[in-house]
């Protein structure tokens, strides 16, 4: 994938558990070893020797662009948006742009029973999500054509882990 868009609710200032599980699995995409034979499967001593011998921490997702939309009905949307965008930036992904990184409240402090109706009525939020997706598409096209380059390309990371 050239780009990733995460759209999620906030639950008590946190990401939903399924998103947390995905993030945990993606640790292998940020410095992980694609060659299981080099560690004999999962032999920890071989893995430690390999790392201490000068592991390059390959960033398999670096250079891909991203968009994040976080929505909630009471609290925590801004915190979660920052957590997700910081994490994606930390692993070398590129934010698509201002309109692609949003946090919004839908049906603020209204009953759960009306949340679907609140979403249907909130056409501004729907436009925000649409703009986030369109911004991501434009960033993907710019990245593929070489017009969008990370400003830190070619620099050596002093502390790669």
Place the predicted regions along the sequence by residue.
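Helix-loop-strand module that forms the ligand-binding subsite of alpha/beta enzymes
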Residues: 1-91
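Glycine-rich phosphate/pyrophosphate-binding loop and the adjoining helix
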Residues: 78, 85-161
